[in-house]
Amino acid sequence: MAKESMKARELKRARLVAKYVDKRVRLKKEGNYDSLQALPKNASPVRLHNRCRITGRSKGYIRQFGISRIQLREMASMGLVPGVRKASW
């Protein structure tokens, strides 16, 4: 499980990206790269990293569900993920 500080840092970055998204698009369209460079580093969407919503785990993230593979397996076996069931053939 990720530290609470890591989860908080990612959340803070996501908020910063959302705050500057319109300004970033406008500056790119104008070609004003000096002003674009002056924006905060964490306002860049490239710096975001996908994390499990439950545990904060960064590896094994499954985008479709927004959780890690481990949590998906546990939740699917308990029947908490609609439409997902154990394969049998």
From Swiss-Prot:
GO biological process: translation
Keyword Ribosomal protein in record: yes
Keyword RNA-binding: yes
A GO MF label: structural constituent of ribosome
Pfam families: Ribosomal_S14 (PF00253)
One term under GO cellular component: cytoplasm
Keywords: Ribonucleoprotein, Ribosomal protein, RNA-binding, rRNA-binding
InterPro entries cross-referenced by the UniProt entry: Ribosomal_uS14 (IPR001209), Ribosomal_uS14_bac/plastid (IPR023036), Ribosomal_uS14_CS (IPR018271), Ribosomal_uS14_sf (IPR043140)
Domain of life: Bacteria
Alphabetized NCBIfam families for the sequence: PRK08881.1
PANTHER family per UniProt: 30S RIBOSOMAL PROTEIN S14, SMALL RIBOSOMAL SUBUNIT PROTEIN US14M
Subunit structure: Part of the 30S ribosomal subunit. Contacts proteins S3 and S10.
Biological role: Binds 16S rRNA, required for the assembly of 30S particles and may also be responsible for determining the conformation of the 16S rRNA at the A site.
Family statement: Belongs to the universal ribosomal protein uS14 family.
Protein name: Small ribosomal subunit protein uS14
Gene expressing this chain: rpsN
